[in-house]
Amino acid sequence: MIFMSTILIVNDDGINSVGLLALSQALKELGEIVIVAPECECSGIGKALSIGLIHVSSVEINGFKAYSISGTPADAYFIATNKILKRKPDIVAAGINLGPNLGLEDVLNSGTIGAALEAAIHGVPAVAISYCIRDIRRKNYVSIDELKVAMDVSRRVVKYILRNGMPNNVQILSINIPEKLSDVRVKITRVAHVGYCDIHCEADNGYRIVPWLIDNYRDAEPGTDVYAVKCENVISITPIRISLNGDCKDVELLVKDVFNT
């Protein structure tokens, strides 16, 4: 008996995103494809979960059976594993996000990576793939042909993980691919610890986020994801672990001093 791998595909750009279709086509030969995605865009929502009612609708995306939910990317993981599949997938592939996910702020804010985090928390290998448009105002004009490099990279990485497992001590791979690459060069990077600049502008008697530009990312050190994409124009592959534990040693000194223990 031949057992096919189950690949759960999610995103934060919504069920109708060309990036979701591109990723599904890229991975279709590697196993059973299950698509669960928000019914509308959820960019910047991180790992948020819905506390209200989540509706699920069965849809078809270019021949792929898919499920559209009125929830978040992290909800998509839970609905897929607990209600649709009723088991864990072999891998979660999140994307192809139309826009960058670079630096610590993006990692914590991204709905794409939020879904990957949810998978990783539950012991499922996860890959988050982002196509780094330099000007997010071009997002709705990206074609599937433009995503060919991102599709090829996604297929290669997911195929490796299904055969060999994740690299040791890695739970998520965040892959950022510069737009319109003429040659494929890859660097292993770390997450840049840089915060956003002033990202809000005045609008309608309030403030809204300005159009997202690669050039607006703060300068980061060589060896980071931001530097690789912004300055070197190469593909960045960033291994991520989700442990939130800090060093207890100095906290012991604090507790002894504050509580006289």
Give short role names for the model-derived ranges.
Residues 10, 36-38, 94-97, 128-130, ...:
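Short beta-strand segments
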Residues 120-142:
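Glycine-rich phosphate/pyrophosphate-binding loops
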Residues 80-86, 114-125:
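Alpha-helix C-terminal capping segments
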Residues 7, 18-83, 87-88:
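A cross-family phosphate/adenosyl-ligand binding-site feature
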Residues 13-21, 206:
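Short acidic, Gly/Ser-rich segments with clustered Asp/Glu that frequently serve as metal-coordination loops
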Residues 107-114:
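Charged helix-capping and loop-helix junction motifs
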Residues 143-145, 164-261:
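C-terminal accessory domains and tails appended to enzymatic cores
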Residues 9-16, 104-107:
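Short, glycine-rich nucleotide/cofactor-binding loops
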